[in-house]
Regions:
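An alpha-helical repeat/solenoid feature that recognizes helix-turn-helix modules
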Residues: 1-41, 52-92, 104, 108-147
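Intrinsically disordered, low-complexity repeat and linker tracts
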Residues: 150-172
Length: 172
């Protein structure tokens, strides 16, 4: 945890991706341990303060789909509906539209938008495997929250039978 409340992989400047991942890792203890709850609350404050006008987030000098995805999973993991919590709505935009601005008709996500600064994570404006993976599991995490289910990494409420097809659409 940095002095600002966010998490960092290296150095002293917080990063949205690492902050989101840290919240995800600590979320099972949120509300149960004062030290963890305090750290997550400080991280949430930092995420609220650093959210971009698009509703999304950035890392290493560039707005990215993966940053928005990590924040969506983090918020969902502690029971925050980012469409309703005013801390995570900027200019009428919230993290899901911040993520879906990177969605491509081919069925996946870009790392960064065409013409955007590239921070080394993938070619701007093109379908990206890591961005798609993270975008899809962020969407699943948010849907699980909306459906009143457990967090993404807690599948204790899920049972599947061989050959069963699960509806993962986001429409309610």
């Amino acid at each position: 945890e940095t002095a600002y409340g966010g998490g960092t992989l290296a150095g002293t400047e917080p990063d949205a991706d690492i902050t989101g991942m840290t919240i995800q890792a600590l979320s099972p203890y949120y509300g149960e341990r004062d030290d963890v709850t305090g750290a997550i609350d400080r991280a949430l404050d930092w995420l609220s303060e650093t959210q971009l006008a698009s509703g999304g987030y950035g890392t290493m000098g560039a707005e990215t789909s993966e940053s928005a995805a990590q924040v969506i999973v983090a918020l969902s993991s502690v029971g925050i509906d980012c469409a309703k919590d005013s801390r995570f709505i900027k200019n009428g935009k919230w993290p899901m539209p911040g993520l879906f601005q990177y969605y491509l008709p081919e069925g996946g996500f870009m790392h960064v938008a065409a013409g955007a600064a590239n921070n080394g994570g993938g070619e701007a404006g093109t379908l990206n495997g890591m961005a798609t993976e993270q975008g899809m599991y962020a969407t699943a995490a948010y849907k699980r929250l909306l459906d009143g289910r457990t967090a993404l990494y807690d599948m204790s409420d899920t049972t599947l039978s061989a050959g069963e097809v699960v509806d993962v659409s986001t429409s309610n």
